[in-house]
From Swiss-Prot:
This is Small ribosomal subunit protein bS20. PANTHER family: 30S RIBOSOMAL PROTEIN S20 (PTHR33398), SMALL RIBOSOMAL SUBUNIT PROTEIN BS20C (PTHR33398:SF1). HAMAP family: Ribosomal_bS20. One of its GO terms (molecular function) is small ribosomal subunit rRNA binding. The keyword Nuclease does not apply. Pfam families: Ribosomal_S20p. InterPro entries: Ribosomal_bS20, Ribosomal_bS20_sf. Keywords: Ribonucleoprotein, Ribosomal protein, RNA-binding, rRNA-binding. Belongs to the bacterial ribosomal protein bS20 family. GO terms for biological process: translation. It comes from the Bacteria. One of its GO terms (cellular component) is small ribosomal subunit. It comes from Cupriavidus pinatubonensis (strain JMP 134 / LMG 1197).
Amino acid sequence: MANSAQARKRARQAVAQNAHNSSLRSRLRTAVKAVRKAIDAGDKAAAAEIFKNSQATIDSIADKKIVHKNKAARHKSRLSAAIKAMAA
């Protein structure tokens, strides 16, 4: 248990930061799922448009260090490859 005023404040801040970071991680997963859903539907134009919008979200979350930049790059790379494979 936090005994000093500073420790109590840091504990409160940690709870708030955890909630905020969790919501951002959820936004990342939602963005990836939206692109995957469009790919599964077979609509390349829609998938490309959703992917274009999702890239900003993915990069933004990586810039805030909620997820590692390499994980964000891996998501974008795999989604891009899946969209390109739709034409083949």
